[in-house]
Amino acid sequence: MASLLWGGDAGAAESERLNSHFSNLVHPRKNLRGIRSTTVPNIDGSLNTEDDDDDEDDVVDLAANSLLNKLIRQSLIESSHRVEVLQKDPSSPLYSVKTFEELRLKEELLKGIYAMGFNRPSKIQEMALPMMLAHPPQNLIAQSQSGTGKTAAFVLAMLSRVNALELFPQCLCLAPTYELALQTGRVVERMGKFCVDVEVMYAIRGNRIPRGTEVTKQIIIGTPGTVLDWCFKRKLIDLTKIRVFVLDEADVMIDTQGFSDQSIRIQRALPSECQMLLFSATFEDSVWQFAERIIPDPNVIKLRKEELTLNNIRQYYVLCENRKGKYQALCNIYGGITIGQAIIFCQTRRNAKWLTVEMMQDGHQVSLLSGELTVEQRASIIQRFRDGKEKVLITTNVCARGIDVKQVTIVVNFDLPVNQSEEPDYETYLHRIGRTGRFGKKGLAFNMIEVDKLPLLMKIQDHFNSNIKQLDPEDMDEIEKIEY
């Protein structure tokens, strides 16, 4: 296949440019004026006021988080979830595979898989691939987290059913954003590098194709609105010829205005023999209702919920008078115990920016991660943190889930997570302090609490039936006795 995406030297140069750009932000006392260009606090420590949203909670963008996890994922994750399979025909045999050779793939596809670095199927792929590659084709609804090989699985299904000699769209994949569509296309490019004459085309914003143009690419990847336009208005895609229909990131789709209705309209124009595959990271009721409307007679793969635990995390709280008191307590803790790497969570961008400047001016190597940064910038910052170039990551809720750094030993809640009703956000608390104590290790969590917020912390303690011990930040002997 011809090169379909940016990458190679250009991609490396862009990564280096981003790293260089953010070195202004993460090195103490080095070119602090560089902060201003990224809307971090001004040189004198005062805060920029151009962005009125800084006082608002930093809202998590599901699509951006999904893309971020794809960008920073370095290898496949072996999920600890138990896989549950519900077959449309319970009496039919259930197959799983341990090697790609068992799937009897075309030689060029096997070469592409191994060239990507896959040695054997992941846990999800073991169960999903026999269903996705079956003859006759079977429909599938699958729950799969980022990093488990889900994209590679449905790309393999598309490439397996494409006829390179037929020059018209045969496979259609819907993604919720332009960037996620490009990420999927990159997987098609890499896996299909040995598939001669198989090509992909992007039905995404900005890719204007004149009405009446004959589309000869076999695989179309796009966002629902543009695909709908290409199919019904511009008549570029004949949906009656589509053999494989993939709907990726369904939970993000239904979170985006109009996408679910557009996707259903596209699906209804597909032939009955078209194979339909839907993937979602979560299976809440709204996702299930959408999946059942759009995928007829499916096999279902679900992940039994992993119980996040706080048992291996020691939790403390410190009573403080104000923001400066919190910072002084943080400094005392920082000076009294050995820290590998730490993540500090703030509820608002304003507090995150203020804390970044305070720590930088005191000589700490810190980086700042918030929702105003692009996904690529966030990925660069996380990679630097993962590489140990900074020891402290200050962030809002954009980092509460899905980002695993083995060296993180301490999590600090500079602000308690609360919902719009100013009640404790229990799930966010769980995922925040879950950034430590991972991979079977013990961890520490510190909560900086103003007196009027203490009832919220007590609700959190009762909710999780856990012990959150009060810590005196002035008692250095007590701090130094803290063990992981």
Swiss-Prot record:
A motif (Q motif) lies at residues 98-126. It comes from the Eukaryota. A motif (Nuclear export signal) lies at residues 62-75. A motif (Nuclear localization signal) lies at residues 101-115. Disruption phenotype: Male mice display normal sexual behavior but are sterile with testes that are 25% smaller than the wild-type. Round spermatids arrest at step 8 and fail to elongate. Chromatoid bodies are unusually condensed, greatly reduced in size and lack the typical amorphous texture throughout all steps of spermiogenesis. ATP binds at residues 144-151. CDD domains: SF2_C_DEAD. Keywords: ATP-binding, Cytoplasm, Developmental protein, Differentiation, Helicase, Hydrolase, mRNA transport, Nucleotide-binding, Nucleus, Phosphoprotein, RNA-binding, Spermatogenesis, Translation regulation, Transport. The keyword Chaperone does not apply. It is found in: Cytoplasm; Nucleus. Pfam families: DEAD (PF00270), Helicase_C (PF00271). Phosphorylated on threonine residues. The phosphorylated form is found in the cytoplasm but not in the nucleus. A motif (DEAD box) lies at residues 248-251. One of its GO terms (molecular function) is ATP hydrolysis activity. The keyword Phosphoprotein applies. Belongs to the DEAD box helicase family. This is ATP-dependent RNA helicase DDX25. The gene is Ddx25.
